Amino acid sequence: MADSPIPSARPARFSRRDAGLGVDPGADLPAGLAAHLAAHLSAVDRPIAAARGLPNAAYTAAEFHRFERAHLFARAWTALAFCADHATPGRVTPVDFMGWPLLIACARDGRPTVFHNVCSHRGRRLVDAPKTTGGLLVCPYHAWAYDLSDASGGLKSTPHIGGVGAHQADGFCRAAHGLKAVRSHCWLGVLFIDLSGDAPAFEEYAAPLVARYRPYLGAAMDGGAAAAEALASPAADAGLTLEAECNWKLAVENYCEAYHLPWIHPSLNDYSPLQDHYAVIVSEDFAGQGTRTFRPALGTGTGDGDGDGDGAGAGDGDGVGGDGDGVGDGGSDGDGAGDGALPEFPDWPAAQRETAEYPVFYPNLLLGFQVNHFFALIIRPLAAGRIREEVRLFYTGDGAHAARCQAARAANLAAWTRVFSEDISAVEGMQRGRQSPGFGGGVFSPAMDAPTHHFHRWVARKYRAALGGGGGCGGDGDGDSNGE
């Protein structure tokens, strides 16, 4: 990684016509807010030394939560869940996505499919709690039933639709009224959705990230069966959930930069100092930061390194990679062969074992790549000023399940938990600051904030497109990977 320089979900049966987005009458901003936003966007796009950040209302106004749901999250590949949590055939799980009811169903082949969680008949929510079905999902209201055995979601049964005892009706076509599928894809153990149906193919969208990191993680970056064999996440000691009283964008912004390292993560800064970190601009849709001093051999399973990375939704980019995660190493001797050591990705170049990078997959997935593990952190916006973060650690080889690695895994999780938690006060403090009329979006350090400015410009392009000012979905915009 030069300086700035799991089985797939089913795509079958997806139809843009039935994507389910429709028109959200509350998705557009009130005229006053829209004008306020439009007036600020040009300042975001200035060269970084003269640029301004997004206005306070984008972080505090409830109207923006709905606006971003429809015009930003729904029109890009967005992280929804972890694939391994939805790999039990017949299992159905309801998921609230920023107020929209969805369901994740697992078909016979173990692959997850996403649908809108609503009956085609009278709009009753179909699934209220996780449950296992026999392949048929029955609405609790009028018992209309949908086929989940092959992930089609087809409408199979309509009791008494034509009158008592008449289960079919003239002119009614069951085939036209199945569950409404949501376009989805599994990659790196994460289940992504495209609610609009208009985003580029996932493989096209993620291609810049795959190209950058495949030389390090190998088959893990490819998806499908090869990735499932290359990666694993243990059932225990592999994840955590945190909540913070902040807007989701502040979590992303904090993750993008290492500038705060000396003050928020001082112990990490002792052995992975700020000067060892660098900006990572992958493409228009992905940016973050990296470190040159992730040292696997530091870990002893006792947590001497802080990891750091990116915290509770407010990561720090330099992440565990910063080295601290050393703890996550459990005493690795560098090649994963030592007792208790976590195996290392076999393709990772030996000359760059101390390099780690922390890109953001916009809008809501924080990634951390280290020689002996990687993590994925999904940010769930719950309200304009509240988020939940779900973190999962992944290992290669037998690192996820071998008893000899148990202490290393537990130490790694403890280190990341400590690091993520350290960032909560920072992002919550920024959220409170957004209530001040004395703050108008802030400014950027040309040396330290390039990825943060990159993210602001990405958001601004989405806003501008929603307001009718151009810039589309996916690889839209003017490309801001230069001059930041």
Each model region followed by its residue ranges:
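C-terminal catalytic domain of Rieske-type non-heme iron oxygenases
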Residues: D3-L21, C106, R111, N117, ...
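Membrane-associated scaffolding surfaces of BAR-superfamily helical dimers
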Residues: G479
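Short Pro/Gly-enriched beta-strand edge/turn motifs at strand-loop
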Residues: A74-D85, H160-Q168, Y358-P363
